[in-house]
Structures are given as C-alpha cells and as structure tokens.
Amino acid sequence: MASLFAQEILSQEILGDFEKTFSTEVCPDDLENTIYTLLKENYSSSCSEASTELKQQTTYKPRILTLANDIYNFFNHELPQMLLDYDDALDVLCTLDVCRFAMDSPSNAYSHLAAKHPANVKIGVDTDLLYADNNDGLKALYYFVNANRAISYDFYDNTLMRTLNTIVVKDRVAIICALDQYNRVNVASVIFDPEKVNQIYVRTLPAFRTSDLLAHATEQLEFYQHGYRTDFYTKDNFQFLLTLGFEYLLPQECWDKIINVAREEYHDEFMALIVAQLQITWEEIFEKNTLDFYVLKSSLMKYIDDGEIIFADVIYHMTPEERKLHIENVLALSKKNRNIQFYVVDDEQLVNKQQMIHFSIFNNRKKLFLKNPGRYHTDVGPYFYSVLSNQLIQRISSYLDDLKNADYCSHYDAESLQTFYDKYSSLVHRMIDLSAFKK
C-alpha cells in the first residue's frame, strides 16, 4: 500500500501537499518508506486504543452472585476489603436494613479492618426491628456502631426504600440485590461501570429524606454551633453511660487545669470558654437534679490506673492526688443530692461484647447523643452521633432503665458507695499510687 500511495502522489505531483499535511519534508526517493512508517505508527496507535477499550469493557463487566457462599464471601470479605483499598473518601448509600445485617453478623466481623480515610454512609433501618420489645435490634445496632466506629453513619427509617435493595458507593461500585422472604440477599448484581454506578446513585439518593433521619454522625464544630451541648444540660433527668473515665463530679482543683489545657495546649479559647461554662452549669445540676451514672467496670479500673478523662473535647489526665480528691468529691456530692445514683456494669459478663462498647451515651430523655472517645486519638470516624427520633430516644431511655435490674449491673447509692469505699479505700489508694510509677 505504501508503494501505491507513493506512486499516486508523485504521478499527481502533490508531494508538497503531502509534506504540509504531515508536517514533514521528504524527497521522492524516500516517500515510500515515509508512508510505510506513518501507516505502521497509525496502525499501532489504533490497536492500542482498541485494546484499552476492550480492557475497560472487561473491567466493567458486572458480576452476578447467586450462590450463598459467594454472596457471603462478597459481603463479608471482598466488599469491605475493596472499600478499604480505595485511596480517598467514600460516599455510600445503602437501602438495606442495618438491624437485620447487624443481628445476622458477628458483632466483631470487621474488627480486624482499619479504615484509613473517611467513609460516610447513609443507611436504612427497619424501625419494626429497632423498636421491638425484646430490644434485640436496638442492642445489635449499638454494637454495630461500636464495631464500626471509624465509619460515619446517618441512619434513616427505611419504610419508603425497602423495595430498592441497593448499595452504591459513589464513583466506585453498585450492588443491586434480590431478597428472600427473610429479607436476606438471595441474588446480587455487582456493577463497576462508573457511569452506571453514578446514575444509580442519583436515582437512589432521594430515598434518603431528611424527615426520615433517625440519627446522624456529627462533628465537633456542628455540635457546638447551635448550642446543642449547652441546651442539653438545661433538663433535669439524666442518664449517662460512660465508657472512658468519669468526667463528672470533678473537684474544684481540676477545673482551672482543664481550662489551661484547652487554652495553652489546644490553643482553643472557645473550648476553654465551653469548659468554664460547663463548670457553672454542672454545679447547679449536681445540687438537685436526677442523675443515673452507668459506668463500665473495665473503664472504671482503667481510670483508677491512668486518670484519663475527656472533658467536653479536652483530653486530660488526672494526677494520682486529683483522682483521690475526685473520689472524695463524688462521695460528698452524692450525699448532698440523693437523686445521684451509680450503676457499675460488669462488661466482662457480656460474652464477646465487652470489647465492643466504646460509645458513651448522654441522655436527658428529650435529647440524646453518643460520644466516641476513640476518635480523639485517631483521624477517622465521627466524634458524636446525634439522635433525632423521639421514639428512639424513649426506647434507649427505657432500655437503660431496665439495665438497672440486669444481673451484671450493681447499684450504688450514697450509703452503699460510702460503705464500699470504707472497705476498699486502702486498696484503691494503693492502685492509684502504683499507677504513678508506670509513667
């Protein structure tokens, strides 16, 4: 072909036009070789483009999962690892019921996975399961949040999205599921084509309506901007489940030091002001309000040993002497206000669950939020969850009330607390003193 093209160009005396078109200079004797080279390069380029297109088509070929074992492996192994392997933040929609998933899966199923980047998930909740009288759905959801505390979830009532059966990771992957009569995945179609994935994302997003939001992940700034925490303490009936230290009923000797940490170490005048305001607010609350403190036995022992508390958003380590003063102040204030009650939860009796309790719960029966102490030592995950649903708040309140009667929960009022302290004070003081030598 190169020879025929060369002969035709020379016979028509259009060599100059050829040189202009291909931006080259060529003598008649070299024309055939030049045309051959151009044809060869163009052929190689077109083959490369065709190969790339073919590879893309292969990459984007959907997967159809029909075998129970394949479905289990995909959702429990492949998909979590796939999400972790991505290099940037993830935006996920899931219309499937998280309560059913949490109840059917081991609570520590993903405990070996560590997220390296932010993941924000909007997910559906079957409120029939969540509000069931046996509390199985409620407990499963709490353990699920704890086990996946590096992921930020927004939980929605899934009443209007139950037929969608869709999971979509924006720009990445979409999974369309067919469910059996027990709402378990029977068939799953996995789509990788980014264009199709994002079309599915756009079609699915409207199902997550603001009016259906039950609880959502919240960052520090958002939590303070609208005075949420200040307003929270204006009520008079509190339930606190504390999973790290005991930041309440602090002695006066600690307040200025915590304020100074906020101001000098955090360089945060706003947080220093928040701490100072809470000091005044809490002094009033502790005088007469009803307060039920639920404290994990494991976190209480850890506090005696290391003195770590997180006051508002300030990490503070109580000195051995401050811890002793703290105990004395707790005893004194609980005697002044008989509405202060303590419940020690022996989390070691919660088989396979004791390592799954990380989020503290702060509840005044009108407003409720969860706090993630671990977030103050990592770069991913939510600081707080704000619960918006009044029905969910009442369900959690009722569950905490019932927790008082559990075999693994010990009740202490002012008298029994003093009796316990009189019996074990020397041991507690020795433990506190020994902790100073571990530094």
Enumerate the language-model features and the residues they cover.
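Basic, Lys/Arg-rich alpha-helical nucleic-acid-recognition elements, primarily the DNA-binding modules
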Residues: 1-20
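Surface-exposed polar/charged interaction patches
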Residues: 7, 41, 333-336, 427-430, ...
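Extended, compositionally biased accessory segments flanking or bridging domains
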Residues: 25-91
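Hydrophobic protein-protein interaction segments
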Residues: 61-411
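Charge-biased C-terminal accessory regions appended to nucleic-acid-, cytoskeletal NTPase
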Residues: 390, 395-439
